[in-house]
């Protein structure tokens, strides 16, 4: 029993390492075919619209409600200590450091990442990618690379929008509804949030998350089994793997950015 369990675990580890190597080789190939996005920027613009603009609604609404909850919870906590003016700092730091990049990346993986995987998988199932190869059109350059870069560019922008609307939500619930002094809200935020230590590190996080989610989405779509069930499984793997990757990367980046390493 123990031997069988260890054997299965070993096979799973070896398979994961092999799949990671295949994925790395695939992404390297996609990156080497990226010149097409400069020669034909329309392809990139279309993919930014597909991955970014069409994700705006869920990002804006989610960011607003997260900000409302943060403001309400922060106010109730700080009220006990007579520091309600610092609620702006709590909301802003929570969003720009953590919740903005992480939650927007999870939402991006669920909405855009799954859609990218499904589109590539369906193109593979209907043999559109094979038809491109027969016509001497490289699908990595024509299809995969623009999708990858569209997701990669969209992710940091969506994270910034999420944080902005989150701060707006925090302002609305604490200043407009509850009655916290608006001047103290903004003054405390401006005094406590540092551009390089807080905002820039949050942007770096969102860039890393964008690379990870976009890489996983295009790889899972291209490697999907060309059947309806295969595409469905690939979409599921994209969402699950992206979520785990984002959370793991968030821990690593936070450890080095804000604590100097563990």
Enumerate the language-model features and the residues they cover.
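Loop-to-helix entry region at the N-terminal start of transmembrane alpha-helices
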Residues: 50, 58, 62, 84-116, ...
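Membrane-interface helix starts
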Residues: 36-61, 240-243
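Hydrophobic alpha-helical transmembrane segments that constitute the membrane-spanning cores
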Residues: 62-65, 105-109, 145-174, 208, ...
């Amino acid at each position: 029993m123990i031997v069988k369990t260890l054997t299965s675990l070993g096979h799973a580890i070896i398979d994961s390492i092999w799949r990671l190597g295949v994925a790395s080789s695939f992404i390297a190939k996609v990156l080497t075919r990226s010149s097409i996005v400069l020669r034909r920027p329309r392809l990139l613009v279309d993919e930014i619209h597909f991955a970014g603009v069409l994700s705006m609604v869920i990002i804006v609404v989610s960011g607003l409600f997260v900000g409302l909850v943060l403001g309400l919870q922060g106010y109730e906590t700080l009220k006990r200590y007579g520091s309600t003016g610092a609620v702006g700092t709590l909301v802003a730091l929570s969003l720009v450091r953590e919740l903005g990049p992480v939650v927007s990346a999870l939402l991006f993986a669920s909405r855009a990442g799954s859609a990218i995987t499904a589109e590539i998988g369906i193109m593979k199932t209907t043999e559109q990618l094979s038809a491109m190869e027969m016509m001497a059109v490289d699908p990595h350059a024509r299809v995969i690379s623009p999708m990858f870069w569209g997701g990669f560019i969209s992710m940091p922008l969506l994270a910034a929008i999420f944080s902005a609307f989150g701060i707006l939500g925090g302002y609305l619930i604490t200043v407009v509804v509850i009655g916290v002094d608006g001047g103290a809200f903004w003054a405390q935020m401006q005094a406590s949030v540092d551009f390089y230590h807080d905002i820039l590190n949050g942007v770096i996080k969102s860039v890393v998350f964008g690379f990870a989610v976009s890489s996983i989405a295009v790889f899972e779509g291209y490697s999907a089994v060309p059947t309806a069930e295969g595409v469905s499984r690939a979409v599921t793997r994209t969402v699950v793997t992206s979520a785990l990757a984002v959370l793991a990367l968030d821990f690593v980046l936070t450890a080095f950015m804000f604590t100097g390493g563990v």
